[in-house]
Amino acid sequence: MKAADLYTFLREPLRAAAKTDPVLIAADDSGLCVDALNGAPGVLSARYASRNGESASDRDNVEKLLSELEEVPDGKRSASFVCAISAILLRNPEGPVELYATEGRLPGVISRAPHGTNGFGYDPVLYLPEYGKCVAELEPDCKNAVSHRGKALRQLAYRYYGIY
């Protein structure tokens, strides 16, 4: 499909929906990016330990990550949770379709063993030096305040409301 055709394909249903209210459609993806692994597991975070392309268990993913980093010294274990959000907005049926992209990051260091139970995925192994604990050890309110998803969503809200 040509880009112009795709644009038309997306624009027309948006125009119909925007006759009553602005329409915002967003999609996101998140992952853990480890510097010593050249950004892996990245977009494959949920399937990192998978052998068949399906999602792997959190435990299997964490075990694979820690195994791959076993020989990496403490000073070289930097990583970030990253959330990318893309959104399209149509404020009125005759207006242009607006495109937005935001990114939120939560930088830290991969610990040598899992810690904490407040979370999922790689939360038990992303250590945040400024808090002295892994993400899974943070209280929910604190975790929500610093999360990569929260940062990306706040950027999107700022852009949306900042020009609305």
Residues of each region from the PLM?
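Anionic-ligand binding patches
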Residues: 1-164
